[in-house]
């Protein structure tokens, strides 16, 4: 009896491990930009995450966070816990515990509807549109939720009544996050996301491999830039390359059309002869 129970618990842990791996696979397939998360090496129920923000009120910030899944995930209907590493001024983030309120988007966890990438998408949304995140919200399942309470009432009041002061407080969060970007990791977990200042000697070779054909030399400016800005430059260069390719297509088609007309005209001349 005891052995049977132990085997059942072991199988449950194995099944849970596969479900967590499946969540990570779905996250990769979602292809979310500028936000990253992965399970820790020590436990699949503890995820490390980081978000880079390039536009809006929170532009220029980099916030780390952890996602703590319930012990019986995904069967448990209780919501995962999201905790930011540094204090972030936002109506949905508690200034004391640094925890994120997920209830505007999720009433309870439904394993057949909700996935971890939905949490990451929600995190992106609250930073890109803070005003919208505190108004009437629609959950992924289609339910409408009216917000009556938030984790940070002061942030909500400033956002609605004194936007300039709100922005000032947000900028304090941004400066603090950038200042501590390269801090020593609080854990020795092998999967913790670590950043280092750009070094041409150490990272130059890797950057060379990432360069598209029309890459502009920005190594000197990257030395003092955030890693997120480096990624933005890579994305911009890739988009520029794609746009140039699109512009070349109509020209090539036009040339082909002109060549076809020339061949047809020459054929008619030969027939006349």
Swiss-Prot record:
Residue stretches in coiled coil: none
Record domain UBC core: where: 15-164
CDD domains referenced in this protein's UniProt entry, alphabetically: UEV_AKTIP
Transmembrane segments annotated in the record for this chain: none
Source organism superkingdom: Eukaryota
SMART domains noted in UniProt: UBCc
SUPFAM superfamilies reported for this sequence: UBC-like
Pfam families: UQ_con (PF00179)
Similarity remark: Belongs to the ubiquitin-conjugating enzyme family. FTS subfamily.
Protein name: Protein crossbronx-like
Lineage of producing organism: Eukaryota, Metazoa, Ecdysozoa, Arthropoda, Hexapoda
